[in-house]
Amino acid sequence: MANAASGMAVHDDCKLRFLELKAKRTHRFIVYKIEEKQKQVVVEKVGQPIQTYEEFAACLPADECRYAIYDFDFVTAENCQKSKIFFIAWCPDIAKVRSKMIYASSKDRFKRELDGIQVELQATDPTEMDLDVFRSRAN
């Protein structure tokens, strides 16, 4: 079904990969992109569980918008191992205005398709989504 605001549909693979990350932890991260010609959100890249945050961040283009899911592992003050599922709306300042508008207008509908997101981040440059930001938002 297409999003009324932007006309973007969500490919079934987007939800499938998210469920694999959430339930089976078979992925560390998922990067999604909007295919304007097909008018839908698709999976661009899936990260293996052993991949690092740095490898994830390197997958986000410096000049194009993306959505991403990151499974963030951390240790609480009580020394408990936990994880939180982050949704990142990556919209660099230097991205094309049209792209920013399409990603912004499609975001809420896309997020509703992914049941289980625990934290949302919006980032326009890498400092807005570095590991310290993840740590502070996870607790």
Swiss-Prot record:
Post-translational modification as stated in the protein's UniProt record: Phosphorylation at Ser-6 by CPK3/CDPK6 inhibits actin-depolimerizing activity.
Q: Where are the transmembrane segments?
A: none
Query: Could you say what the effect of mutating residue 135 to A is?
Result: Reduces binding affinity to F-actin and actin-depolimerizing activity
Q: Provide the effect of residue 137 to A.
A: Reduces binding affinity to F-actin and actin-depolimerizing activity
One Pfam family from the record: Cofilin_ADF
Keywords, alphabetical: Actin-binding, Cytoplasm, Cytoskeleton, Phosphoprotein
User: What Gene Ontology terms describe what this protein does at the molecular function level?
Assistant: actin binding
What CDD domains does UniProt report for this protein, alphabetically?
A: ADF_cofilin_like
Residue stretches making up the ADF-H domain: 5-139
Phenotype upon knockout? Answer: Increased length of hypocotyls under dark-grown conditions.
Residues that the record marks as modified (Phosphoserine) are: 6
Q: Kindly list any coiled-coil regions of this protein.
A: none
Tissue specificity is:
Expressed in vascular tissues of all organs.
Q: Name one GO cellular component term.
A: actin cytoskeleton
* Record family assignment: Belongs to the actin-binding proteins ADF family.
**Known function:** Actin-depolymerizing protein. Stimulates F-actin depolymerization. Involved in plant development, cell organ expansion and flowering by controlling breakdown of thick actin cables. Severs actin filaments or bundles and promotes actin cytoskeleton disassembly. Binds monomeric actin (G-actin) with a marked preference for the ADP-loaded form and inhibits the rate of nucleotide exchange on G-actin.
What's the name of the protein?
A: Actin-depolymerizing factor 1
Question: What gene is it encoded by?
Answer: ADF1
